[in-house]
UniProtKB/Swiss-Prot annotation:
Organism: Myxococcus xanthus (strain DK1622)
Keyword field: Cell cycle, Cell division, Chromosome partition, Cytoplasm
InterPro entries in alphabetical order: ScpB_csome_segregation, WH-like_DNA-bd_sf, WH_DNA-bd_sf
Family: Belongs to the ScpB family.
PANTHER family linked: SEGREGATION AND CONDENSATION PROTEIN B
Chief location of this protein within or outside the cell: cytoplasm
Annotated compartments: Cytoplasm
Highest taxon in the source lineage: Bacteria
Oligomer and partners: Homodimer. Homodimerization may be required to stabilize the binding of ScpA to the Smc head domains. Component of the Structural Maintenance of Chromosome (SMC) condensin-like complex composed of ScpA, ScpB and the Smc homodimer. ScpA and ScpB bind to the head domain of Smc, the presence of the three proteins is required for the association of the complex with DNA.
GO biological process: cell division; chromosome separation
Induction profile: The 3' end of scpA overlaps with the 5' end of scpB, indicating the genes are cotranscribed.
Protein name: Segregation and condensation protein B
Region (Disordered): 1-39, 252-274, 286-329
GO cellular component terms, semicolon-separated: cytoplasm
Length: 329
C-alpha cells in the first residue's frame, strides 16, 4: 500500500511482472469465459455420434404387435396404397410373406391388394406394370416403352449369344444337369459359355452328383426368372406350346403376306371394263394363233425329215468278215 496526495492506494502488480501473480491458466480462463466455439463443436459432434450409434430410427423401434394392430384399422384403399408404396421402393420381387412382415397386413388382404394393383398397373394401360416374377411381385416399366427408357438411361439392352441361349435352354429344361451332358447335347465344348452364364448370375451350382468323379450339377437361378419375367420354372413353355406358338406366327405371316384389295380411286378401279374384255379376247386370240404356228412348224419339220431320208443316196458301209482283229476306233 502507498500513500499519495489523494490518499492511500493499493498497488497490485500486473500479472507476469516480478512480485505479482502468475498468468491465468487455460482452465481458469475457461471457467470464467466458458468453452470456446471449437470446444462446443467437439461436444456437439461427440453427442451426435453417440446418439446415432445408440438410438435406432423410430420406425424400426415399433413392435410388430403394434404394427399389426395399426394395420387392422386400415381401409381397403389404404392397404392398396401401402402395398403399392412398398413394392415401388423394393429393389427385387417381394413375396406375400415379405410384404406381411413389412406391413403387418393380413396375407389375404395383401393378395386382394395385389389383384387390384395388377388390374391398375397392367400392360397397355400403365407405364408401370406389376409382374409376378421369381416367386414375388415387382413393378417394371412397360415393355413397349423399353426403347425410350433405354434411350433416356443410355444403356444397351442385354443380349445373349446363340450359344448362350442354347446352353441356357438345356440347363433350364434338364436341370440339374452336368457339363458333359450339356456338351453331349450341343456337340461342342461349353465351359466358357457356362462360365459366362454364371458371371451373369443366370446359372448357379446346385451341388455334385453322387457318381464317379462327382461332376458339378448346374441349374437356373432366381435372377434367371427375373431376367425372363417368369413366375417359376413351371411357367417355361412346353414343346406343345412352342409348336402352337410357331403355327400361330406362321398364320400371322401368311395373313400379312396376302395381297391387299385394290383401294378406291386407283388405276384398277378407274379402268374401262369393256376395254379390259377386248384386251382379254385379243390375248386369247394371240395365244391360239401362236399355238397354230407352233403346230405348223412342227409339221414342216417332220416333212423335212421324211424328205431327207428318201433322198439320202449314201451307200452303206461294206461288212467285213474278219471278226478276230481289233476294230478301229
Amino acid at each position: 500500500m502507498t500513500t499519495g496526495s489523494n490518499g492511500p492506494q493499493d498497488e497490485t502488480p500486473e500479472p507476469g511482472t516480478p512480485g505479482g501473480p502468475g498468468p491465468f491458466s487455460e482452465e481458469e480462463i475457461a471457467a470464467v469465459t466458458g468453452p470456446g466455439p471449437a470446444d462446443e463443436l467437439d461436444e456437439l459432434e461427440a453427442a451426435s455420434i453417440e446418439e446415432d450409434s445408440d438410438e435406432a430410427p423410430p420406425d424400426l423401434e415399433t413392435s410388430f404387435e403394434k404394427l399389426l394392430s395399426k394395420s387392422r384399422k386400415l381401409s381397403t384403399d389404404r392397404i392398396r396404397t401401402v402395398i403399392e408404396s412398398v413394392l415401388f421402393v423394393a429393389e427385387r420381387p417381394l413375396s406375400v410373406d415379405e410384404l406381411y412382415m413389412a406391413t403387418g397386413i393380413e396375407r389375404e388382404l395383401i393378395a386382394e391388394a395385389l389383384n387390384q394393383l395388377s388390374g391398375i398397373h397392367r400392360d397397355g394401360i400403365s407405364g408401370i406394370v406389376l409382374y409376378e416374377v421369381a416367386g414375388g411381385w415387382q413393378f417394371r416399366t412397360d415393355p413397349h416403352s423399353g426403347e425410350y427408357v433405354r434411350r433416356y438411361l443410355r444403356v444397351k439392352p442385354q443380349r445373349l449369344t446363340r450359344a448362350a441361349v442354347e446352353t441356357l435352354a438345356i440347363i433350364a429344361y434338364r436341370q440339374p444337369v452336368t457339363r458333359p451332358e450339356i456338351e453331349d447335347i450341343r456337340g461342342v465344348d461349353c465351359g466358357a459359355v457356362i462360365k459366362a452364364l454364371m458371371d451373369r448370375k443366370l446359372v448357379k451350382i446346385l451341388g455334385k452328383r453322387e457318381e464317379v468323379g462327382r461332376p458339378i450339377l448346374y441349374g437356373t437361378s432366381r435372377e434367371f426368372l427375373e431376367f425372363f419375367a417368369l413366375k417359376d420354372l413351371s411357367a417355361l413353355p412346353t414343346l406343345r406350346e412352342f409348336h402352337e406358338l410357331t403355327q400361330e406366327h406362321r398364320e400371322i405371316v401368311e395373313k400379312e403376306d396376302k395381297p391387299a384389295p385394290p383401294a378406291a380411286g386407283t388405276v384398277e378401279a378407274l379402268s374401262d371394263p369393256a376395254f379390259t374384255k377386248r384386251m382379254e379376247k385379243s390375248a386369247a386370240a394371240s395365244e391360239a394363233a401362236l399355238e397354230d404356228l407352233e403346230e405348223a412348224m412342227a409339221a414342216a419339220d417332220r416333212t423335212q425329215k421324211v424328205s431327207s431320208s428318201v433322198l439320202d443316196t449314201t451307200p452303206p458301209e461294206p461288212e467285213t468278215g474278219d471278226t478276230t482283229g481289233p476294230k478301229p476306233e
